[in-house]
UniProtKB/Swiss-Prot annotation:
GO terms for molecular function: electron transporter, transferring electrons within cytochrome b6/f complex of photosystem II activity; electron transporter, transferring electrons within the cyclic electron transport pathway of photosynthesis activity; ubiquinol-cytochrome-c reductase activity. This is Cytochrome b6-f complex subunit 4. It comes from Pyropia yezoensis (Susabi-nori). It is found in: Plastid, Chloroplast thylakoid membrane. Belongs to the cytochrome b family. PetD subfamily. Keywords: Chloroplast, Electron transport, Membrane, Photosynthesis, Plastid, Thylakoid, Transmembrane, Transmembrane helix, Transport. Pfam families: Cytochrom_B_C. HAMAP family: Cytb6_f_subIV (MF_01344). PROSITE patterns: CYTB_CTER. It comes from the Eukaryota.
Length: 160
C-alpha cells in the first residue's frame, strides 16, 4: 500500500471538495500503467487457469443427454430469462409485452437525465436512481419467481 498515491489532506482545495462529498476521484492509484499493465493480465491469466484447472479436474458432463424425441411437459428458459418470460406470458397482447420489455432500457436511459443536477456518486445521495434500482430489483425477482408457477398464479404468486 505504500506505493499508492496518498491524498494530501492538508490541501484546502481537496478538503473543500471532500466536505461537499466530492473529490474522491482526484487521488489514488492511476489506472495507467498500474491496472492495465499489471493487475488486468494477472486477473485474466488467473481466470483462465482456474477455468482450465476445473475443466481438467472435473470433466463430467452436465445433466443428462438430450433426446430430441422426448419433449418436456413444461418448457422453461434459463433462470436469467424468467422475468421477461413471465412478462410475455401474462400480458395477453404480445405487442404490449414486447413494448413493456423495451420500456425497461428506455426508462433506465432517462434516469441520468432526471438526476443530472446531482453531483454525488454516493447511492444514498441519489434517491431517484436508488429507488428505480430497488423497485426494478424487487419486480424482477417477483416476476422471476412467478415464471416457475402456473399462469394463474404468475403475478400474485398464489399469495392474494
Amino acid at each position: 500500500m505504500s506505493i499508492l498515491k496518498k491524498p494530501d489532506l492538508t490541501d484546502p482545495k481537496l478538503r473543500a471538495k471532500l466536505a461537499k462529498g466530492m473529490g474522491h476521484n482526484y487521488y489514488g492509484e492511476p489506472a495507467w500503467p498500474n491496472d492495465l499493465l499489471y493487475v488486468f493480465p494477472v486477473v485474466i491469466i488467473g481466470t483462465f487457469a482456474c477455468s482450465i484447472g476445473l475443466a481438467i479436474l472435473e470433466p463430467s458432463s452436465i445433466g443428462e443427454k438430450s433426446n430430441p424425441f422426448a419433449t418436456p411437459l413444461e418448457i422453461l428458459p434459463e433462470w436469467y430469462f424468467f422475468p421477461t418470460f413471465n412478462l410475455l406470458r401474462v400480458i395477453p397482447n404480445k405487442l404490449l409485452g414486447v413494448l413493456s420489455m423495451a420500456a425497461v432500457p428506455a426508462g433506465l436511459l432517462t434516469v441520468p437525465f432526471i438526476e443530472n443536477v446531482n453531483k454525488f456518486q454516493n447511492p444514498f445521495r441519489r434517491p431517484i436512481a436508488t429507488t428505480v434500482f430497488l423497485i426494478g430489483t424487487v419486480v424482477s425477482i417477483w416476476l422471476g419467481i412467478g415464471a416457475t408457477m402456473p399462469i394463474n398464479n404468475a403475478i400474485t404468486l398464489g399469495l392474494f
